[in-house]
């Protein structure tokens, strides 16, 4: 295996996990803050708000998992090596 391709794969996998975690992390923080604010304003709607929050958090977390899958593919099943 070419050492340059190997080093680039490690760097790319690190970047894919790091960059894939930034957006969902910010989004999850914002969504949780807005959910807490919504529950504080309307306590009777807590069940609907919490259900919607958990579903949206799962969708946001899936983006981070996709970044992890790309990183693992680059590390262990690299298509750029012969």
From Swiss-Prot:
InterPro entries: ATP_synth_csu_bac/chlpt, ATP_synth_F0_csu, ATP_synth_F0_csu_DDCD_BS, ATP_synth_F0_csu_sf, ATPase_proteolipid_c-like_dom, F/V-ATP_Csub_sf
Subcellular localization(s) per the UniProt record: Plastid, Chloroplast thylakoid membrane
Keyword hit for Membrane: yes
Chief site of localization: plastid
Gene3D superfamilies assigned: F1F0 ATP synthase subunit C
Molecular-function GO terms, alphabetical: lipid binding; proton-transporting ATP synthase activity, rotational mechanism
PROSITE patterns membership: ATPASE_C
Residues under site feature: Reversibly protonated during proton transport: 61
Regions crossing the membrane: 7-27, 57-77
GO CC annotation terms, alphabetical: chloroplast thylakoid membrane; proton-transporting ATP synthase complex; proton-transporting two-sector ATPase complex, proton-transporting domain
Other known facts: In plastids the F-type ATPase is also known as CF(1)CF(0).
Entry-linked NCBIfam families: ATP_synt_c, PRK07354.1
Quaternary context: F-type ATPases have 2 components, F(1) - the catalytic core - and F(0) - the membrane proton channel. F(1) has five subunits: alpha(3), beta(3), gamma(1), delta(1), epsilon(1). F(0) has four main subunits: a(1), b(1), b'(1) and c(10-14). The alpha and beta chains form an alternating ring which encloses part of the gamma chain. F(1) is attached to F(0) by a central stalk formed by the gamma and epsilon chains, while a peripheral stalk is formed by the delta, b and b' chains.
Function: F(1)F(0) ATP synthase produces ATP from ADP in the presence of a proton or sodium gradient. F-type ATPases consist of two structural domains, F(1) containing the extramembraneous catalytic core and F(0) containing the membrane proton channel, linked together by a central stalk and a peripheral stalk. During catalysis, ATP synthesis in the catalytic domain of F(1) is coupled via a rotary mechanism of the central stalk subunits to proton translocation.
Protein name: ATP synthase subunit c, chloroplastic
Source organism: Rhodomonas salina
Taxonomic lineage: Eukaryota, Cryptophyceae, Pyrenomonadales, Pyrenomonadaceae, Rhodomonas
